[in-house]
Amino acid sequence: MSSSNLAGNTNTTTTSSAASAAAAHSAANASTITSEYSTTQTTTGTFNTDTLSSIGSTSTLHGSQPSQPPPPPPPQVSSPIAAAAAASAALVAQLNPADRWPTEPSAYKLDESIGVGATATVFTAYCLPRNEKVAIKCINLEKCQTSVDELSHEIQAMSQCNHPNVVSYYTSFIAQEELWVVMRLLNCGSMLDILKRKVKAIGKEQAQFGVLDEVSIATVLREVLKGLEYFHLNGQIHRDIKAGNILLADDGTIQIADFGVSGWLASSGGDLSRQKVRHTFVGTPCWMAPEVMEQVQGYDFKADIWSLGILAIELATGTAPYHKYPPMKVLMLTLQNDPPTLETNAERKDQYKAYGKSFKTLIRDCLQKDPAKRPTASELLKYSFFKKGKDKKYLVHTLIENLASVPVVAHHSSKKVASGKLRKDAHGNWEFEYDSPQESDDDSDLEDEEREKKKKKASASASGAGAAGAAGGATGGAASGAPSAQEGGGATTPCPETLNMVLRVRNQQRELNDIKFDYTKSADTVEGIAHELVTAELIDCHDLVIVAANLQKLIDFAESKSDRRSITFALNSGVHANEIPDERTLTGFAQISLLD
């Protein structure tokens, strides 16, 4: 918000030792996910359960009695933290001592953050006993809101993931309220890093005609498809295929960043129902398949094939289609327009003429709006385009050695995007009316500085409100316990250009918070304000759209001189376990009001 005074906070749980600094760092950088170790929604689904041994299971010889008494049943665990601890301990116990990685937080020294999401942060780290660098994903289990059974099953399934094109899982353990997942760290970064360095090496003028050549693209995509084939044959969906999640090792190995748990926790037993896949709306949906956006009938592994098609465009042009637009506009463009092509990013005719028919055919087939018409990973590997692919040595030469002198480009927490407004169409549906997209990232450093200033503003305290004070919102009038006007508000009339508002919503600790902010018509957008609330962790990421829509409703009421001063609405994030939605107490609901 350009001129808003955002106030409010959420209670945070302090972690010990290195995790404390890590958690603080992640909270300050939770706006978007652009790093190579993306932490929003990665792999979902499970392996075929026939190949997995469940925790605490018993075994007998066929046709005979067991040779030894069966082990006692596993202890009953009643929280995600206890479940994660039990599952992780069971996995470690199955390993030979020589293969075991340390499972104490003190054995690792966390370094820089390389990926930030709504419920987790990925760090580079140093394993002291093994004298080895690793990647550690720190997942806040309280925010995951997953069941005990899901957590136990998915940690075990993740440990069984073993493929040369998937990042290796080492171990996992509990550190305070967090689950730490230790994985291999690939030291050459992601394909997003490579794209940025390539653009810097050849210059923006040359890069506008294509960033990577077809041979490099074919080699990279072939390895990605091998990893996806492995996922899909084992009943998994990755859901976050993009350049930032495709990693490169110094020997030319391509691996998919599979940080498992935050994505695995989003579904259970292959259940791809609407309720289980809501989490896909975290982050910019440039790579998201239409059926995932619609959230009507669920989706299957063909969603990854769509993302692969977007990845192909990204590797060629340097960016995904619609990357300059706000998330809501990306949703609209993807759903309403024809599928993107290589020319979607073009600004002139024949801009990408260097790319041939076989490459464009691959993109076209991947980006079929009907999932049934998209080929499988196994079928794609037979496409003629991949005959152009080379071996790992080629990638070492073209993507590592040739770019060795180019400095690594720092990741910004988010790109500058176009502004716009939510408007209601003739049928009463909400649509995003955008201004013009940004043409350059040259101001990104200034943007980051401005963002830091806004984050400091957002650290102002929120006032805790009693449950009884939430009554009255259902009628649409001012609630009897509605937040009081700011001091001095009765003496002066605020500028008509600016509206003072307050959002009353429960935090993760289920306490009612009043989050005060202002809306300036000439400077703010409702989508931008909602995004800032998510960034400051004042509202759940799943509530971004619904908060923006109701904020626009209230603004419309104010502009029409309506007497209505408050709106109560249901939240997409729902309620916690053992809670019942209650509009009166704002359990599963929120209330937005105008201040006098």
Curated annotation (Swiss-Prot):
Lineage of producing organism: Eukaryota, Metazoa, Ecdysozoa, Nematoda, Chromadorea
Localization per Swiss-Prot or TrEMBL: Cytoplasm; Nucleus
Region annotation Disordered: where it falls in the sequence: 1-80, 429-496
Single biological process term from Gene Ontology: cellular hyperosmotic response
Name the UniProt record assigns to this protein: Germinal center kinase 3
Catalysed transformations (reactions): L-seryl-[protein] + ATP = O-phospho-L-seryl-[protein] + ADP + H(+); L-threonyl-[protein] + ATP = O-phospho-L-threonyl-[protein] + ADP + H(+)
Transmembrane stretches, start-end: none
Species of origin: Caenorhabditis elegans
Cited CDD domains: STKc_OSR1_SPAK
UniProt feature, compositional bias: Pro residues: 67-77
